[in-house]
């Protein structure tokens, strides 16, 4: 299925049915009272996050979604039927924005999450509601309310634990193939990857994580060059970035250090928050170099990019904040198991820290609420 990560649609809820003006007509009851029922409510339009949907492609072809109107009220106290709602299934990770106001309507982050995009109009009131002591035969009823209508921008950001970052042809697709069941298109030319690919990396029965391979970046990507910033957004929800560098480019004029610095510069220009995400360095294609040349190129690269963190041969107890360096061959799988093992350990620790932080915040909130509650008299006698 073709991956589509942006779409524009229009949604319109149904109008409420009109209330009825009607009077009882029975034998031997010449002056029957009002019996006009209310109109039914108009159908609403909802968005629902669905983990089995992974693209916005259908919203490129069908751009308008109109819910039905509510049924009008009837005599004999019969209310009009409400119209059915429309539910639009969207991928988890879809951001929905109102095109007219710029408001973020919804951020679909988990399976089954539902958000109302356009609310159906209320049904009108029948004349049964307007009977009074001075007006025994009211002819008044009200029309149904109009339903809401919106023009919306849908934007899909893939949800992944780890994002692969790098220039075209750095070997990102080969890496995700080596460590997961994902099978992206791979060839020896830039921009092989034309849309994000997701792969599930399984460590054991109880541990796995999701890795995202986005199209390669080039200098100027933050301004839209190449495949542009439309793919940088997919990295914003990841918890860890792997900066993959081709240490043995076929083109001898290519400088890996300059390319790596260009990528870092693009991140900084695009989004400071994205630039500040934990980012590990992965030097790829060691299978193309002998041991001595690999050592020399690695040393030259690290000096050129100003790497002042632990080197490959250092014995160092990594913490959560320290960037890490890996030397691998995605093609031969050299070093990939150590890489995914450390990623898994990092993500486990990250989730533990986040859970502890959330629990502490909940406890602090509960204390604050308790302190704001009025103190009640316990009924205990206290002598003056």
From Swiss-Prot:
Q: Name one GO molecular function term.
A: GTP binding
| Cofactor entry | Mg(2+)
- Domain of life, per lineage: Bacteria
According to the UniProt record, where is the region Disordered?
Answer: 20-46, 364-384
Region forming the signal peptide: none
Residue span(s) of domain Obg: 1-159
Residues at which Mg(2+) binds: 173, 193
**Annotated EC:** 3.6.5.-
Q: GO:BP terms for this protein? A: ribosome biogenesis
Composition skew (Gly residues), residue ranges: 33-43
InterPro entries under this entry?
A: G_OBG, GTP-bd, GTP-bd_Obg/CgtA, GTP1-OBG_CS, GTP1_OBG_dom, GTP1_OBG_dom_sf, OBG_GTPase, P-loop_NTPase
Q: Name one GO cellular component term.
A: cytoplasm
Assembly, in brief, is: Monomer.
The record's annotation in NCBIfam families points to: Obg_CgtA, PRK12297.1, PRK12299.1
Q: What is known about what this protein does?
A: An essential GTPase which binds GTP, GDP and possibly (p)ppGpp with moderate affinity, with high nucleotide exchange rates and a fairly low GTP hydrolysis rate. Plays a role in control of the cell cycle, stress response, ribosome biogenesis and in those bacteria that undergo differentiation, in morphogenesis control.
Similarity field: Belongs to the TRAFAC class OBG-HflX-like GTPase superfamily. OBG GTPase family.
Q: Protein name, please?
A: GTPase Obg
Which organism is this protein's natural source?
Neisseria meningitidis serogroup A / serotype 4A (strain DSM 15465 / Z2491)
Q: What's the name of its gene?
A: obg
């Amino acid at each position: 299925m073709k991956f589509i990560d942006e779409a524009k649609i229009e949604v319109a809820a149904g109008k409420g049915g009109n209330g009825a003006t009607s009077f009882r007509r029975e034998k031997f009851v010449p002056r029957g009272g009002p019996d006009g029922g209310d109109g039914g409510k108009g159908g609403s339009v909802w968005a629902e996050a669905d983990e089995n949907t992974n693209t916005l492609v259908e919203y490129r072809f069908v751009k308008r979604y109109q819910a039905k109107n509510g049924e009008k009220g009837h005599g004999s106290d019969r209310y009009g039927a409400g119209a059915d709602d429309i539910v639009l299934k969207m991928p988890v990770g879809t951001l929905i924005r109102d095109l007219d106001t710029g408001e973020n309507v919804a951020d679909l982050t988990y399976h089954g999450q539902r958000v109302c995009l356009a609310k159906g109009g209320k049904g009108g009131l029948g004349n049964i509601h307007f009977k009074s002591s001075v007006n025994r035969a009211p002819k008044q009823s009200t029309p149904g309310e109009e339903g809401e209508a919106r023009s919306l921008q849908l934007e899909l950001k893939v949800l992944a634990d780890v994002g692969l970052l790098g220039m075209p042809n750095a070997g990102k697709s080969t890496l995700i193939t080596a460590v997961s069941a994902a099978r992206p298109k791979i060839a020896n030319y830039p921009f092989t990857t034309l849309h994000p690919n997701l792969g599930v990396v399984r460590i054991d029965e109880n541990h796995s994580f999701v890795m995202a391979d986005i199209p390669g970046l080039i200098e100027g990507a933050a301004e839209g060059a190449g495949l542009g910033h439309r793919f940088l957004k997919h990295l914003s929800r990841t918890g860890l970035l792997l900066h993959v560098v081709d240490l043995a480019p076929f083109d001898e004029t290519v400088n890996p250090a300059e390319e790596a610095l260009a990528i870092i510069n693009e991140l900084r220009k695009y989004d400071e928050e994205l630039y500040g995400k934990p980012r590990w360095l992965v030097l790829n294609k060691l299978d193309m170099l002998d041991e001595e040349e690999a050592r020399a190129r690695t040393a030259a690269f690290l000096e050129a990019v100003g790497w002042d963190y632990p080197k490959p041969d250092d014995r160092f107890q990594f913490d959560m904040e320290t960037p890490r360096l890996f030397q691998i061959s995605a093609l031969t799988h050299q070093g990939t198991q150590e890489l995914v093992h450390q990623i898994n350990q990092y993500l486990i620790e990250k989730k533990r820290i986040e859970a502890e932080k959330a629990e502490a915040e909940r406890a602090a909130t509960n204390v604050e609420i308790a302190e704001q509650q009025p103190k009640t008299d316990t009924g205990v006698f206290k002598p003056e």
